Amino acid sequence: MKTLATIGDNCVDIYPQLNKAFSGGNAVNVAVYCTRYGIQPGCITWVGDDDYGTKLKQDLARMGVDISHVHTKHGVTAQTQVELHDNDRVFGDYTEGVMADFALSEEDYAWLAQYDIVHAAIWGHAEDAFPQLHAAGKLTAFDFSDKWDSPLWQTLVPHLDFAFASAPQEDETLRLKMKAIVARGAGTVIVTLGENGSIAWDGAQFWRQAPEPVTVIDTMGAGDSFIAGFLCGWSAGMTLPQAIAQGTACAAKTIQYHGAW
């Protein structure tokens, strides 16, 4: 099985209604979910020298993630206020903290050389690394979330093997966007559709996957777990539809409890 590292965002998700805080963020979540499939991933991110930063590093280590490049910086760890409305998470105030200045060092790049797959997301300030990583032969994946107006759709996709995004539902406008993304150089684009499943375009055909019927407790981490399940499936040699099915199953597991993991 191939090796995987994530780079970029982390945050502590604070649930005032539950009086609890959970470690999270796309790069952190994807790394943790990959451990479900026997992968020991690495993660490059920045945390503050506060209690939340200590918590996040301890949580990652406990879950089996290599935290040697989770760097502690002076300041506060990124934080997101989260409310639950009918078991769906609604994001409130966000404090970016030390992540506002995140950038990879030359030593970080050297450390990434050992990994086959590198993933990041649109919040992680990691997009500048992808041309170099892709040119070095890494399999690259990037999550655009629902930011369809981002200029990165024009500049970043030629350096991506997998472009992930989210949308409410499938329609002709979405399908045309997906075709254009692959035409600009992305290998495959995969869009999660919440309760409507997911759709992928690989340049030859569309692939659709229905969601698994489960009782939803909290949708936090659903998209991140889909990405992790998919990438682990692909790294193990699964076909595209098989990897999508594994991503769907991983997301179904995650949404049945509070917090990302």
Swiss-Prot record:
Keywords: ATP-binding, Kinase, Nucleotide-binding, Transferase. The keyword Phosphoprotein does not apply. One of its GO terms (molecular function) is ATP binding. PROSITE patterns: PFKB_KINASES_1, PFKB_KINASES_2. Pathway: Carbohydrate metabolism; fructoselysine degradation; D-glucose 6-phosphate and lysine from fructoselysine: step 1/2. It comes from the Bacteria. It is an enzyme of class 2 (transferase). It catalyses: N(6)-(D-fructosyl)-L-lysine + ATP = N(6)-(6-phospho-D-fructosyl)-L-lysine + ADP + H(+). InterPro entries: Carb_kinase_PfkB-like, Carboh/pur_kinase_PfkB_CS, PfkB_dom, Ribokinase-like. Induction: Induced by fructoselysine and psicoselysine. Makes part of the frl operon with FrlA, FrlB, FrlC and FrlR. Gene3D superfamilies: 3.40.1190.20. The keyword Nucleotide-binding applies. Its EC number is 2.7.1.218. Monomer. Catalyzes the ATP-dependent phosphorylation of fructoselysine to fructoselysine 6-phosphate. Functions in a fructoselysine degradation pathway that allows E.coli to grow on fructoselysine or psicoselysine. To a much lesser extenst, is also able to phosphorylate psicoselysine. Belongs to the carbohydrate kinase PfkB family. This is Fructoselysine 6-kinase. The gene is frlD.
